[in-house]
């Protein structure tokens, strides 16, 4: 080892003790001063020169000689100082890299701080579902259409073109759109026209569901729309409380409480047990056809309901006063005309039988009260001449009888008062007090009039013999009154 190298090693150990603080540090100087030597750090620092590794100090003569040589060669060893300071710069560069190293590192690799995401990462992120319900989406699609109606496929096409989320998941939500169209009352189905070919029906909005969304915002819906039932065709201006109660019961869920507006009224426009007014004034129409019977027309005019009498059926006439007599109608009724081509019947038998039956039916109910005065005077004499025949006596009928005529079944003949019959005991032909006295001569009609005008409960002066010229056919038999006792007091 030369003296110069020793001197440089001593100076470097004194000037940079921190750089050589590690144990067993060794610095080799390669090359001379002019050659630009290189300093290399070894595994451990080297001990200073004054401390020998073998543990003995050099002699003082050698130490002085070394100091002198160092002073002489101080100029030549000046280039050793930068080489001695080089490890300090290298250590600093190794501890904290300079700005150039940091710039190089930033160019080669990404920094530890967060950076903006690239475009590929944004496309891989999932799409956000729109905050609208299916009802709102359907309403949007229908409102934007020109005719305000769309089919199911057109609604799905609008939603897919408007929102990318539904475009990617198209097959999944199509059934939800179909269910909302069918289950919500705010959507109305319109059948397709016959001349408009295609598949599916049209869907539109109910006119009453315009305020379904709050302030026109599709994000908030006020309430579920319910379609109201149609009102009756002719609502009553002032409904009866009974009808209101029926309507409330029907709304409460009682199906039997609700009655239609027309079924709530009877056949004559009145309620069952309630005097309800009619719905309104009847429409003006033609006047009812006048009925030939004046009483029936008056009854139809005074009826509480506006009903017309059917043409084939006449209304029953109102009951008359109790004092009216049935003979008034009999007097006003025309006499039955005989059949054409037939001669007058003997003694008017057919007409008499019909008149007798008619008078017998109407006489007894009306005979309970005394007839009105002057009623019998209006009795037609033609009826008496045609239907009544008085018998002049029991023997007179038997003398003029013919064998080929029809026998009579009158009460007098059955009682045995015909021709040849014996009179009941205690009753003579000329007895005026007997009810079975025969009407003699032309006074028989007067007795008939007297009987008709007299009260029904008073006995008549003479009995009318309604007999026939053929009474003699049965007169040969025994008398019926002779076998039965106590029949003398019977009027008929």
Curated annotation (Swiss-Prot):
Keywords, comma-separated and alphabetical: DNA-binding, Nucleus, Phosphoprotein, Transcription, Transcription regulation
Residues within the DNA-binding region(s): 129-223
Residues with PTM Phosphoserine: 96
Record GO cellular component, one term: nucleus
Annotated PROSITE patterns: FORK_HEAD_1, FORK_HEAD_2, FORK_HEAD_3
Tissues of expression: Expressed at high levels in the ventral region of newly formed somites, in sclerotomal derivatives, in lateral plate and cephalic mesoderm and in the first and second branchial arches. Other regions of mesodermal expression include the developing tongue, meninges, nose, whiskers, kidney, genital tubercule and limb joints. In the nervous system it is transcribed in restricted regions of the mid- and forebrain.
Bias-annotated ranges (Low complexity): 13-22, 83-107, 323-334
Main localization (coarse): nucleus
Domain of life: Eukaryota
Biased amino acid composition, Basic and acidic residues: 47-59
Residue spans of biased composition, Gly residues class: 394-403, 416-431
Segments of skewed composition (Acidic residues): 60-74
GO molecular function, one term: sequence-specific double-stranded DNA binding
Compartments where located: Nucleus
Record region (Disordered): 13-125, 309-344, 394-441
Pfam families assigned to the protein according to its UniProt record, in alphabetical order: Forkhead
Role played: Probable transcription factor involved in embryogenesis and somatogenesis.
Protein name: Forkhead box protein D2
Organism whose genome encodes this protein: Mus musculus
């Amino acid at each position: 080892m030369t003296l110069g190298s020793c001197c440089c090693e001593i100076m470097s150990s004194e000037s940079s003790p921190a750089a050589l603080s590690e144990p067993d540090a060794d610095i080799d100087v390669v090359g001379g001063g002019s050659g630009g030597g290189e300093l290399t750090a070894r595994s451990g620092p080297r001990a200073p020169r004054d401390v020998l590794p073998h543990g003995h100090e050099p002699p003082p003569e050698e130490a002085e000689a070394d100091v002198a040589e160092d002073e002489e060669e101080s100029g030549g060893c000046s280039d050793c100082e930068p080489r001695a300071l080089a490890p300090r710069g290298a250590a600093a560069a190794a501890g904290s890299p300079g700005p150039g190293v940091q710039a190089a590192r930033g160019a080669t690799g990404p920094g530890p701080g967060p950076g903006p995401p690239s475009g590929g990462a944004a496309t891989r992120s999932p799409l956000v579902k729109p905050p609208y319900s299916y009802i709102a989406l359907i309403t949007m699609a229908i409102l934007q259409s020109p005719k305000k109606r769309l089919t199911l496929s057109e609604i799905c096409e609008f939603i897919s073109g408007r929102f990318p989320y539904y475009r990617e998941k198209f097959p999944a939500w199509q059934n939800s759109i179909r269910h909302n169209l069918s289950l919500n009352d705010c959507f109305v189905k319109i059948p397709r026209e016959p001349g408009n070919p295609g598949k599916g029906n049209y869907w539109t909005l109910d006119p009453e569901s315009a305020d379904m969304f709050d302030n026109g915002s599709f994000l908030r819906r006020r309430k579920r729309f319910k379609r109201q039932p149609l009102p009756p065709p002719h609502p009553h201006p002032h409904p009866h409380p009974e009808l209101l109660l029926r309507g409330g019961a029907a709304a409460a869920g009682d199906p039997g409480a609700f009655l239609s507006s027309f079924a709530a009224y009877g056949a004559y426009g009145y309620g069952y047990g309630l005097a309800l007014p009619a719905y309104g004034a009847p429409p003006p129409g033609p006047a009812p056809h006048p009925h030939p019977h004046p009483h029936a027309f008056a009854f139809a005019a005074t009826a509480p309901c506006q009903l017309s009498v059917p043409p084939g059926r006449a209304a029953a006439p109102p009951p008359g006063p109790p004092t009216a007599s049935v003979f008034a109608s009999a007097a006003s009724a025309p006499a039955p005309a005989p059949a054409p081509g037939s001669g007058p019947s003997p003694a008017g038998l057919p007409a008499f039988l019909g008149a007798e039956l008619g008078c017998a039916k109407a006489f007894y109910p009306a005979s309970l009260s005394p007839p009105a005065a002057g009623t019998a005077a209006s009795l037609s004499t033609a009826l008496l001449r045609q239907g009544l025949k008085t018998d002049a006596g029991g023997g007179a009928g038997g003398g003029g009888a013919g064998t080929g005529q029809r026998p009579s079944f009158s009460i007098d003949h059955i009682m045995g008062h015909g021709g040849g019959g014996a009179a009941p005991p205690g009753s003579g032909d000329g007895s005026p007090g007997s009810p079975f006295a025969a009407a003699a001569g032309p006074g028989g009609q007067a007795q008939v009039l007297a009987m008709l005008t007299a009260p029904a409960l008073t006995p008549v002066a003479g009995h009318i013999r309604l007999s026939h010229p053929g009474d003699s056919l049965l007169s040969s038999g025994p008398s019926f009154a002779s076998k039965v006792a106590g029949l003398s007091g019977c009027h008929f």
